[in-house]
Amino acid sequence: MTNPAPIEAPLPKGVTDFLPEKADKIGYIEGKIRRVFELWGFRRIITPLLEFQDVMAAGLGEDLKERTFRFDDRQTGKLLAIPSDITPQVARIVATRMRGCPLPHRLYYIGRVLRHVELQSGRSRETFQAGVELIGLDSPEADAEMVAMAVEILKGLGFEEFKVDLGHTGFIRGVMAASGLGGDARRRLQEAVGKKDSSAVRAILETEPVADRIKEELAALPRLFGGREVLAEAARVATSDSSRRALDNIAQVLDILDIHGVSDHLTLDLGEIRGLDYHSGLTFEGFVTGIGEAVCSGGRYDNLTQRYGYPAPATGFAFNILALLNALEKRPDVEASKTRDLLIFNLKDDRREALEIAQHLRALGYSTARDIIHRDFNDSLDYARRMNILRMMVIGGDYCAADEAYVVRVADKRGTAVKKADLMRNDFSLNTLP
């Protein structure tokens, strides 16, 4: 009997299926992140997959508003939205459901969002996010905590070559306000600064009525990138009080991060313009060597919950799980695949003993599968290897005595006999086997 030909079942562009091996790696990454979030005292929150469009849009920046998927609700006729970011959902929940709870709120989430993208770019419409929101604290220590957590997670995932770039929207806003530029000139200037294009910045300033002192400050922006010494150069050219306050804030955060012991992984980028319509203070992005996109990003957003009627200072950040997956897959020395403990290979006609042993081992916490398909020893061993199972247990046959089971280490086919009575003890451990 031949198998029927598979039907065509294409997916829309920008989404993908994750088969067990990659799904295991995603689960591994999420587990590592979740563990750190909880060690720092954050509690999980789960947000819905649908929001009313007007409610969702209240918490989004202009870019994400344009990239949100929208459609009509057949029940109400209102416009619904699939969330393009989880942070506004958390802000809404805190403002409407948790305003009577004591501050600060330490909340974390793990979920997926959907965004319109240019499909020619090959980018994914789906983003897997894992993030935290610290709501109710306006202090350098709160900002530093976000950065320190991000560094701890990246280290915990086995990365050594990575940097976290710090910026500050207050500094950029102060500089831009001092220029007196508006409209298209300001937009072009911000774009040139964001690209670190010094020649474009100078060309724009040559055609605009900006004071020489301010021109010096603006021309310096693309160069304000590096270590802590950047603060001194920025202070030398800063002309506005708001920019100077931002520099003081960054210095305070850096002092606390030095106590956390993460300074070696930090750089300053005071020409960073990301999030000017959303963030209200310190911002940061994390980059792993060899990966072009940021693996995490975040910052302060003191005005977000106010959009839902509840003014509260807040900061947070999120990891892009698929970017982390991409980075891990470039590191063969980092083991991110999930292993299973045991495959039971039963050669007896009676399945009762095999089922009882499997049930007992699961109760002890060992992942245990039964090879129900009838095949020979080598085929079952090959199946275990391909399924990333560490050991195979043979029950029955001539591999050992009748009161024993034969446990084979899949990696090297090394086997050992184990008394079945020992297997059924409550203190039995697979780790004691060779």
UniProtKB/Swiss-Prot annotation:
Location(s) in or outside the cell: Cytoplasm
Pfam families: tRNA-synt_His
SUPFAM superfamilies, sorted: Class II aaRS ABD-related (SSF52954), Class II aaRS and biotin synthetases (SSF55681)
Family statement: Belongs to the class-II aminoacyl-tRNA synthetase family. HisZ subfamily.
Protein name listed in UniProt: ATP phosphoribosyltransferase regulatory subunit
Oligomeric form and interacting partners: Heteromultimer composed of HisG and HisZ subunits.
Domain of life, per lineage: Bacteria
Additional free-text comment from the UniProt record: This function is generally fulfilled by the C-terminal part of HisG, which is missing in some bacteria such as this one.
UniProt keyword annotations, A-Z: Amino-acid biosynthesis, Cytoplasm, Histidine biosynthesis
Function: Required for the first step of histidine biosynthesis. May allow the feedback regulation of ATP phosphoribosyltransferase activity by histidine.
GO terms under biological process: L-histidine biosynthetic process
GO CC list: cytoplasm
Pathway participation: Amino-acid biosynthesis; L-histidine biosynthesis; L-histidine from 5-phospho-alpha-D-ribose 1-diphosphate: step 1/9
Keyword Zinc assigned: no
Matches recorded under Gene3D superfamilies: Bira Bifunctional Protein, Domain 2 (3.30.930.10)
Record organism: Geobacter metallireducens (strain ATCC 53774 / DSM 7210 / GS-15)
Record-linked InterPro entries: aa-tRNA-synth_II, aa-tRNA-synth_II/BPL/LPL, HisRS-like_core, HisRS/HisZ, HisZ
